[in-house]
Structure formats: structure tokens, C-alpha cells
């Protein structure tokens, strides 16, 4: 059993607050994590819960991810009011919050104009409903969690639209020297998710990319093997590997 009281502390990060600028302009995805990690280091909190996709591939000194919760769906979706498929758009405007998604959209449909879109999932869907954009690419995991699946028009396979590393995974972090908390977190760790997460993060770490690097990566366990799909774009977006 578990006999400790858990107090949940909600922390608004700079990534949540500055939603009128591109992620890369305000310090990258890591901005969603750094301020929470600082509170963990200062012992203001004992456990930090992150979306793994927002975390740096390098572990923060003194901290450790000690639990990966079972992965939600890692796939990407197309949300639109007027179109059923992204290929149906002849001339239109799609909202994207990342360079990776922007370049992947162009591979699927070169006629589409891609413009930056920020805000939480509700805000982005509202912009679609108002006609500000013809569609937007959103993570299926977020839409499922928020019960917004009814807005989905198309779900892409992991091969046709490779997601960002760690998509759909919740990572639970604690201090490296906090043995009591580590024992607790070990009990909720999902080993298959951990294996895939480590494979994806190792790939990112090897590349040495940052928030401006357009790269997708998805690992799936198949028996004793890991099937890792990856996609990397050159800085100018003209080459894809």
C-alpha cells in the first residue's frame, strides 16, 4: 500500500504563458520543463511530471526520469472543419507549431501554405472553427485525453507522419539521490514504454539536435526487436533522410 499524502502543485511555465510566439523564439520546447526542474532541484517539489516530447534528450544533472507511464497513442491527426483529408486541400492554410510538422505537411501536399499556430489544443481547434485556418496537425494523445476526438478528420500512420520523439509518453522525474521516491516511481514504470522512450531519446542525443531541428522518431517493440522509424530534414527543408 501507499500511505503518504500527495499534494499536487500546478506550475505555469514560460512555455504556457508566452503563446503568441513560436516555441523556437522563446527558448524551445525545453522551456516547458526547465522551471519545473528548478523547483525539483530546490526541493520545492519531490516529483515532476512532464510530457516526454518536451524534455531535452540529455538528463538534467542531479535529476532522473524514473518512471515512464504506459504510452498513449503516438500518432498525429488532421483536424479540419471543411476537409476530410489533408490531400483534399488544393489551396489552403494549415496551422503548425513545429518545423518538423511544417515540412512533413509539405511532403504530403505541396500546395498547402503552412503558418505558425500556438495556444493549447482547445484554442487551436477554436481557430479552425472560426475559419482562421483550414486545418491543423495535432497529437492524437492530447485529443484523446481531452475528449476531443470528434474533431479528428484523419489519423496518420506512424510511417506516413512520423511524430516527435517521446510523443504520447508521460515521464515522471525525481532527484537522483532521492531513494525513497525512486522506489515509489519504479512501481508505476511501464517497461515496454521505457524501452521505446530510451531508443527514441538515444537517437535524438546522437543527432545532437535542438528545438529547431526538424526530426521525427518513433520506436515500436516487435517481439525482441525495436522497430525505429526516423525522419530528418536539412535546415533549409530541401533534403529529407
Task: Label each residue range with its predicted role.
Residues 1-25, 102, 107-241:
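Small-molecule-sensing regulatory modules
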Residues 45-49, 134-135:
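Short, Asp-centered acidic motifs that coordinate Mg2+ and/or phosphate
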Amino acid at each position: 500500500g501507499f500511505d503518504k499524502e500527495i499534494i499536487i502543485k500546478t506550475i505555469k511555465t514560460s512555455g504556457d504563458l508566452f503563446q503568441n510566439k513560436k516555441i523556437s523564439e522563446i527558448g524551445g520546447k525545453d522551456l516547458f520543463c526547465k522551471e519545473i526542474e528548478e523547483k525539483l532541484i530546490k526541493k520545492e517539489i519531490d516529483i515532476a511530471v512532464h510530457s516526454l516530447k518536451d524534455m531535452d534528450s540529455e538528463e538534467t544533472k542531479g535529476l532522473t526520469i524514473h518512471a515512464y507511464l504506459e504510452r498513449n497513442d503516438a500518432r498525429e491527426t488532421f483536424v479540419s472543419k471543411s476537409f476530410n483529408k489533408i490531400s483534399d486541400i488544393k489551396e489552403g492554410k494549415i496551422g503548425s507549431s513545429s518545423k518538423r510538422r511544417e515540412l512533413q505537411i509539405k511532403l504530403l501536399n505541396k500546395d498547402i501554405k503552412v503558418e505558425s499556430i500556438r495556444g493549447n489544443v482547445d484554442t487551436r481547434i477554436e481557430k479552425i472553427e472560426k475559419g482562421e485556418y483550414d486545418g491543423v496537425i495535432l497529437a492524437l494523445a492530447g485529443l484523446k485525453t481531452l475528449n476531443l476526438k470528434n474533431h479528428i478528420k484523419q489519423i496518420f500512420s506512424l510511417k506516413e507522419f512520423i511524430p516527435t520523439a517521446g510523443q504520447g509518453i508521460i515521464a515522471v522525474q525525481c532527484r537522483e539521490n532521492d531513494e525513497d521516491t525512486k522506489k515509489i516511481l519504479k512501481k508505476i514504470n511501464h517497461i515496454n514504454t521505457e524501452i521505446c522512450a530510451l531508443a527514441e531519446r538515444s537517437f535524438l542525443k546522437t543527432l545532437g539536435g535542438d528545438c529547431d531541428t526538424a526530426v521525427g522518431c518513433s520506436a515500436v517493440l516487435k517481439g525482441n526487436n525495436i522497430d525505429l522509424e526516423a525522419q530528418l530534414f536539412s535546415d533549409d527543408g530541401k533534403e529529407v533522410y
